[in-house]
Swiss-Prot record:
Pfam families the record matches: EFP (PF01132), EFP_N (PF08207), Elong-fact-P_C (PF09285)
General function of this protein: Involved in peptide bond synthesis. Stimulates efficient translation and peptide-bond synthesis on native or reconstituted 70S ribosomes in vitro. Probably functions indirectly by altering the affinity of the ribosome for aminoacyl-tRNA, thus increasing their reactivity as acceptors for peptidyl transferase.
Pathway assignment: Protein biosynthesis; polypeptide chain elongation
Species name: Streptococcus pyogenes serotype M49 (strain NZ131)
Protein name: Elongation factor P
Keyword Magnesium (UniProt): no
Assigned protein family: Belongs to the elongation factor P family.
Subcellular location: Cytoplasm
PANTHER family reported in the protein's UniProt record: ELONGATION FACTOR P (PTHR30053), ELONGATION FACTOR P (EF-P) FAMILY PROTEIN (PTHR30053:SF12)
Keyword Protein biosynthesis attributed: yes
Gene: efp
Amino acid sequence: MIEASKLKAGMTFEAEGKLIRVLEASHHKPGKGNTIMRMKLRDVRTGSTFDTTYRPDEKFEQAIIETVPAQYLYKMDDTAYFMNTDTYDQYEIPVANVEQELLYILENSNVKIQFYGSEVIGVTVPTTVELTVAETQPSIKGATVTGSGKPATLETGLVVNVPDFIEAGQKLIINTAEGTYVSRA
């Protein structure tokens, strides 16, 4: 059992028969009354997100999540296909469940598949990935305003803000946790 006050982003727990992943968690102390935990949660099975509050002392059953190394094979229609790199078993995951993760991976990329018992519940991507700029505005000579930048569409469809000197065709390192530009590759 785990108390609501100990729940952090990324943790998974069971409540009311649902498997729930914490997206955001924060303590909130109103001017009057007891402390509450405000949380943004995702139902792992349906993909729906919702906001809720809990008392800090409420207890939940922490879900045991196992991960296995896998390779992203391809996407067809509404299904993404992955292969366990140890056993060569293949897994089909609805695109709706891994839509955000697919923005960071290319075919044949290494990932980790998450299991709850024998049920596939998600994919973990590396903390940084290397992607190529598919489209961006041309650089303007003399544009030296610091902190500006421009949007760039990467080969997976992800749009990130990049410095003005970045051009189409360049490879970039992207932080997958925040979806931000780190450096040129």
